[in-house]
Design a protein with these regions (language model features):
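Domain-level signature for soluble enzymes in the chorismate/prephenate branch of the shikimate pathway
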Residues: 1-92
Length: 92
């Protein structure tokens, strides 16, 4: 394999690993949020917060030269998964 391509792929592998660990950490925190919401009888979803987050992160994507539509799709996927976890926590 070409050495340049090998270095690119190693960088991608490292970034992918970092993404997985960051997502794991994020889900630990959102799990705690879900448990808090369940014990305090709060709704699993907060549409206002979600929209503020999407708007903020779309701007970050623009600042980072990343497609904001892609970023929003990715984040909505994560948010939907978090809400599913919060709904499960509420059900017990």
């Amino acid at each position: 394999m070409d050495e340049t391509l090998k270095r690119y792929r190693e960088s991608i592998d490292n970034i992918d690993a970092a993404l997985v660990f960051m997502l794991a950490e994020r889900f630990k925190v959102t799990q705690a949020v879900g448990e808090y919401k369940a014990t305090h009888d709060l709704p699993p979803a907060d549409p206002g917060r979600e929209e503020r987050q999407i708007s903020r992160l779309r701007q970050l994507a623009l600042d980072a030269n990343l497609d904001p539509d892609f970023t929003e799709k990715f984040l909505r996927f994560i948010i939907d998964e978090v809400i599913r976890h919060h709904e499960a926590a509420k059900r017990g």
